[in-house]
Amino acid sequence: MDQAIATDPEARAFAEDGAILLRGAFADWVEPLRAGIETLMAHPGPYERSYTPKDGSARFFQDLCNWQRIPEFRAFVEQGPGAAIARRLMGSQGARFFHDHVLVKEPGTSLVTPWHQDSPYYCVEAEQSVSFWIPLDPVGRDVTLECVAGSHLWTKALKPKRFDGTDLYEGDDREDMPDIEAERDKHRILGWEMQPGDAVAFHYRTMHGAPANTSPQRRRRVFSARWVGDDAVFRDRGGRGSPPM
């Protein structure tokens, strides 16, 4: 299955760019994941982190680490092709599931997901890592996830921030994140029009962000699933771990 879904050229592109598109990789899981998200939104977990814009537009729902209590999410993790694809892309002998993350931008929300890397937020250190960003609704190029090609190879440690722009860790003296939006012409920015069941696979260090959902009618439901490989170790970053450890 991993040979058929993640080819050698895709694995090489993942290593070089830190982000690739996998067409139809999770098409069989669209309906189960949609059902799981409806259950989750009706009964959020303890790690829900939703945002409501100050301008009164629709909310941006987020929730993490629910795969052990939402049956459809557990089935995806244990029976789906994610682990096999992750092993292939990471070049790892094994693949350990790290966590799930649901992101729902309701129609008309003005909230933008700012440019960031995931690695500074996680209680893990891993060169072998991959996130799958799986839309459950059609996603136009204007509202899709965007990734800075090759940014997973940047050597500088960058300062993580909350979505409101404040520092995540007090007294953090690392370099600020570059203003990708202001210098888009200096980077090769990857982004794709996507269908339900497609996926963007990206490295934890890949710089990424996403626009507001400007559609007045269409939701943008996304299920993200994250794996780590053989070299992953626990890293206490001084904050609340995700997943809790």
Report the location of each language-model feature.
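Non-heme Fe(II)-dependent double-stranded beta-helix
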Residues: 1-16, 21-115, 121-123, 160, ...
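Non-heme Fe(II)/2-oxoglutarate
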Residues: 36, 47-48, 52, 157-163, ...
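Active-site rim elements
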Residues: 70-75, 184-190, 210-211
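Short, charged/polar surface micro-motifs in flexible loops or helix N-caps
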Residues: 82, 92, 107-110, 138-141, ...
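Short, structured patches in soluble enzyme cores that scaffold and shape functional sites
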Residues: 101, 117, 134-138, 147-149
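Glycine-rich phosphate/pyrophosphate-binding beta-alpha loops
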Residues: 118-120, 129, 209-213
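Short, conserved beta-strand element in jelly-roll/cupin
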Residues: 123-140, 193, 226-229
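Double-stranded beta-helix
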Residues: 141-207
